[in-house]
């Protein structure tokens, strides 16, 4: 089928849009920490079942100490820090603006790759960073009565949004290091294990995320809140669907998309979530959407696309 990869990439963007909407609902009903714990545990069950079905083991095969270290570190930064900030941003500024700040992930990943891995930082990447930041600025800044620029969103929500994008970007680079180590440790004859390496890597990251969130919950003495959360049917349904459409369907389809089209095209189309989420967020949460915010979201996505040209 012609343009199959492009179609799948658009489906991924839609899937992540649905994930963000359900995550906002779940976070507001259950709490960001509770939502993250439940989502991580559900992710482990789904990923473990997938690995078991195809490889005969629910746990990552052939992953050595180096792979576990780097992928666990990636899970700590990307899930424990990044997702904690992301889900809190949903509570403070909503999933629409939360996803807008996630466009900071590609520039952060580019900078982290340059610093940590010695990767080349092209002029397109630098331009993409400036365009992305401009788009975010257009969306979240207003001129006050004194004609001075000011935030139109709660500062705490903006900081959580920035933390989410930065955490996601750094976590991505650490994940790349971990997957490189993992790939070397898999025997050439184990093609199935090699094909499922992204799922196994996500499993390792999710283990760190789940353990980390449970430790935070224990430190804050909030284990009892999981019982209360389990009784909230709407909140639990939101957590379930956020897990299915995000870590499970979103990840699997994103891996499939790059098999049928160029990675740059797939990445750009999958980055359309900040635009796709505008109308559903307006309908579901009665959020007022201005023309300037739509333009800002479009500019941010254009900035992201420059990283892949």
What are these regions (language model features)?
Residues 170, 175-177, 250-270:
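Alpha-helical transmembrane segments and their membrane-interface junctions
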Residues 74, 119-132, 196-209:
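Alpha-helical transmembrane segments
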Residues 1-14, 107-166, 170, 176-177, ...:
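Juxtamembrane helix-loop boundary signature in multi-pass membrane transporters
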Residues 86-105, 114-121:
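Membrane-interface helix-loop-helix junctions at boundaries between adjacent transmembrane segments
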Residues 41-46, 101-115, 130, 208, ...:
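Alpha-helical transmembrane segments of compact multi-pass small-molecule transporters, enriched
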Residues 11, 38-39, 101-104, 123-127, ...:
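Hydrophobic core positions of alpha-helical segments in small-molecule transporters
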Residues 1-15, 20-34, 38-73, 83-93, ...:
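Membrane-interface interhelical linkers
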């Amino acid at each position: 089928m012609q343009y199959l990869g492009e179609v799948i990439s658009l489906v991924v963007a839609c899937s992540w849009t649905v994930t963000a909407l359900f995550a906002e609902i779940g976070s507001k009903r259950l709490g960001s920490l509770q939502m993250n714990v439940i989502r991580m545990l559900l992710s482990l069950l789904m990923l473990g079942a997938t690995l078991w079905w195809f490889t005969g083991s629910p746990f990552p095969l052939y992953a050595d100490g180096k792979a576990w270290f780097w992928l666990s570190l990636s899970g700590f930064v990307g899930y424990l820090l990044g997702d904690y900030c992301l889900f809190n941003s949903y509570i403070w500024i909503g999933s629409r603006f939360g996803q807008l700040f996630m466009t900071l992930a590609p520039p952060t990943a580019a900078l982290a790759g340059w610093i940590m891995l010695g990767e080349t930082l092209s002029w397109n990447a630098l331009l993409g960073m400036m365009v992305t930041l401009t788009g975010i600025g257009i969306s979240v800044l207003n001129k006050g009565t004194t004609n001075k620029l000011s935030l139109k969103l709660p500062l705490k929500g903006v900081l959580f949004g920035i933390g989410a994008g930065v955490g996601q970007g750094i976590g991505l680079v650490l994940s790349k290091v971990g997957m490189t180590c993992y790939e070397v440790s898999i025997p050439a004859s184990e093609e199935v294990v090699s094909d499922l390496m992204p799922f196994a890597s996500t499993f390792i990251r999710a283990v760190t995320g789940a353990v980390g969130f449970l430790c935070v919950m224990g430190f804050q003495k909030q284990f009892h809140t999981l019982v209360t959360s389990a009784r909230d049917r709407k909140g639990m349904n939101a957590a379930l669907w956020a897990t299915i459409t995000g870590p499970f369907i979103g990840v699997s389809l994103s891996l499939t998309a790059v098999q049928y089209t160029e990675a740059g095209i797939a990445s750009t189309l999958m980055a359309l979530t900040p635009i796709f989420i505008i109308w559903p967020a307006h309908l579901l949460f009665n959020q007022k959407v201005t023309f300037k915010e739509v333009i800002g979201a479009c500019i941010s996505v254009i900035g992201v696309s420059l990283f892949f040209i």
